[in-house]
Amino acid sequence: MSARPITIGLVAGETSGDILGAGLIRALRGHLPEARFVGVAGPRMQAEGMEAWYDMEELAVMGIVEVVERLPRLLRIRRDLTRRFTALRPDVFVGIDAPDFTITLEGRLKRRGIRTIHYVSPSVWAWRQKRVFKIGRATDNVLAFLPFEKAFYDCYNVPCQFIGHTLADAMSLDPDKAAARQALGIAAEARCLALLPGSRQSEVAMLSADFLRAAERLYECFPGLEIVVPLVNPARRAQFEHILVAVAPALPVRLLDNQARQAMIAADAALLASGTASLECMLAKCPMVVGYRMKPLTFALARRLVKTPWVSLPNLLAGRELVKELLQEACQPEALAAALEPLLDDDDQRAALLAMFRQLHQQIRCNADEQAARAVLALINR
């Protein structure tokens, strides 16, 4: 009888996890061409040959109401996965993101003697820090995108490996600004500002008016300023268009459909909501200002829970305020415009900022897929 192939269990719960999982499978195939991959997968992981017991869509729920409605089904799936992985006894189990689902599953499997990895650290360094103890009990290794995440886990003696960020691998150290401008129809000599008011309905509602009023002030300072606004989907575009007509109908703004990365590369500066967009903007080598608002009660709660001095990833990576953050009441058109003006006009300030962006990019550009694969192999061979 032939020996059983190396078997790796994987669970991904959303599109970003499906992308990471597919990259991990590709990298592992380079070392283990006969390996078997089973679990919960999206279309990209299945295209790499993974056997899906459940489709990823089963786990992809958003919002409290939907989670409550789907909770019995989610709990049944987790119990079934626990049973099936326990019976199969994979050589290693990898939970990809979706921490509320996967970390509990990892803990159950680890108690049954199955080695486990959690791929993508939750933001325990920022809030709900006591989760680190549950993670430590549940996993044999955490794979972290960012170096300060590993430093946090080290403080609690929880095994963690910094593998770099897949987004940093995907983007050039020296983006082609001329090509991006040509693709978007922006003149090489024009000043260009990108506005990115977020991907969520609530973000576009809270930020768009202030962002547009800031852009109006900058247009007065820099006549002919090109203003581009990439929007993530038709719903956000329609929402933004409604606000534009109400707030700044005369402002010459060009709306783009889901071309955020090209807009960042093409722009001289960007005004954006916090989140992964700030990291992507740094990797695009585009100077930025971060503006963010939320409902007062939510902000008050966040201030009590969040333990970091900054919210944007460039600042967290640099360990200082590299990028201006204007949050809540500070997120006013006058302040936003004042922070953006030197980024559009001061070549020395821009050059210093871009040099730092490039340095930080190099720091997290580590071939994350391959690093993750090697971490999995190390655990299998331990």
UniProtKB/Swiss-Prot annotation:
Q: Which reaction equations make up its catalytic activity?
A: 2-N,3-O-bis[(3R)-3-hydroxytetradecanoyl]-alpha-D-glucosaminyl 1-phosphate + UDP-2-N,3-O-bis[(3R)-3-hydroxytetradecanoyl]-alpha-D-glucosamine = lipid A disaccharide (E. coli) + UDP + H(+); a lipid X + a UDP-2-N,3-O-bis[(3R)-3-hydroxyacyl]-alpha-D-glucosamine = a lipid A disaccharide + UDP + H(+)
Pathway(s) where this gene product acts: Glycolipid biosynthesis; lipid IV(A) biosynthesis; lipid IV(A) from (3R)-3-hydroxytetradecanoyl-[acyl-carrier-protein] and UDP-N-acetyl-alpha-D-glucosamine: step 5/6
Q: Read off the SUPFAM superfamilies from this record.
A: UDP-Glycosyltransferase/glycogen phosphorylase (SSF53756)
Q: Tell me its EC number(s), please.
A: 2.4.1.182
Q: Has keyword Transferase?
A: yes
Q: Which family does it belong to?
A: Belongs to the LpxB family.
- Fetch the NCBIfam families from UniProt: lpxB
Task: Give the HAMAP family listed for this entry.
Answer: LpxB
Q: What is this protein called?
A: Lipid-A-disaccharide synthase
The organism encoding this protein is Sodalis glossinidius (strain morsitans)
> What are the leading ranks of the lineage?
Bacteria, Pseudomonadati, Pseudomonadota, Gammaproteobacteria, Enterobacterales
Query: What is the name of the gene encoding this protein?
Result: lpxB
